[in-house]
Amino acid sequence: MILLDISSIDLSLISTIVIPPIAGSIIGYFTNDIAINMLFRPYKAIYIGKRRLPFTPGLIPRNQERLAQKVSDTIMGSLLTPEELQKLAKRLLKTERVKGAILWLLNLALKQVKSDKQQKTAKILSGILEDLFSESLPRLLKALARRQDFLEGQINQIFDQILLDFKLTDTQARQFADWLLEGVLPPDILRQALVDFLTERNIQVIDEGVREKTSGTYWVVANLFGVRNTLLRLRSFCLEEKEVANTRLKEILLSLEVRSRLREWLQSLSLQNLPVSTVRQLRKTTRETVQLYVQQSGEKFIQDFGKTVDWEQLSILIINRLQNSAALTTSLETISEELALILERYLEEDLEKIVAQAIPILSIDKVIIDRVNATSPQNLEMAVQGIVKSELQAIVNLGGILGFLVGVFQTLLFLLR
């Protein structure tokens, strides 16, 4: 009897009770997909004849340029503000990161120099050095030389620490004395100097002076015999007997121990033995002489000196030494750290200005607009669908639940009637 009652239930009543919740769940679950499809499709306008059908293309493809502008304004107005860009720049430009980047660049440059087969680096360095000595340094020296205190401290320091304490050693004094007696004043030179000195006029002056300024026994000898004949005979002897005269002069130098006396005099020669006033005046004269020379001829001297140097060969030598220098390799980290600290101090003061200047240059808003406009509606739809499925699945599920509840509510209303 019960089975007959169940089978006799009206199928329309069952469908009225069951279908609304099921239909509501289906509609609620797929509403998001339908809404997204309605926003993007159709992708292109549909024409019948020359007339475009309403609502074609979809809402977003039809207003993609305006959407791009809105996206750009939203991002630049709330996300990528100047303050946020400053924070981003500070995070990117932390000292450790900057140090690592600089160290990487320095190591890369060092590897490039080591692998340079055509000596390009040497040519660049030679050009820099040549310009430095031929143009830049002479101009700088010319400008600095106009100052009255130019090189004053340096010259005084050299004078006080080197020249004032300079003193010949025994070996140096011996070599200097030998050079003077053998190279500068040998017997032949002394003999010729004696001949040149004993002219007729000089002999007459000497003879008259001896006659007038002597007294006593010397006056008698000078006036009776005179020195004129003696000097004339000495001059004739030096002219006629050159070898003998040279030998006699050499013997005189040996007997007088001129070499030893000259060596002792050279060893005792020192500026410290001079009076303090004389030393001060000598230091002042030395400084003024050097300054005057630099002012008048320093520029030309440096230019001429630069022309005598093979800068390319010197550059190759410098680079080869740097390539094999262990100190350079170990100092790269220190250099990068110091440069990073310098950059950090600079950014602390001017980061706001730099960011303000960089924003118009980067044109981030234009980049956003161009990227949105360049993205096809299909790709935009796929991106939105991907976000919904991966990040907003709970909303989709909630839509299905709400649709089911609405269907149940409709069923209850129907039953209450």
Curated annotation (Swiss-Prot):
Transmembrane domains' residue ranges: 395-415
Coiled coil: none
Transmembrane helix found in the keyword field: yes
InterPro entries: DUF445 (IPR007383), UCP032178 (IPR016991)
Main subcellular localisation: membrane
Membrane topology: Single-pass membrane protein
Localization, UniProt: Cell inner membrane
Pfam families: DUF445
Assigned keywords, A-Z: Cell inner membrane, Cell membrane, Membrane, Transmembrane, Transmembrane helix
Highest taxon of source: Bacteria
Gene Ontology CC, one term: plasma membrane
Family recorded in the similarity comment: Belongs to the UPF0754 family.
Protein name listed in UniProt: UPF0754 membrane protein cce_2569
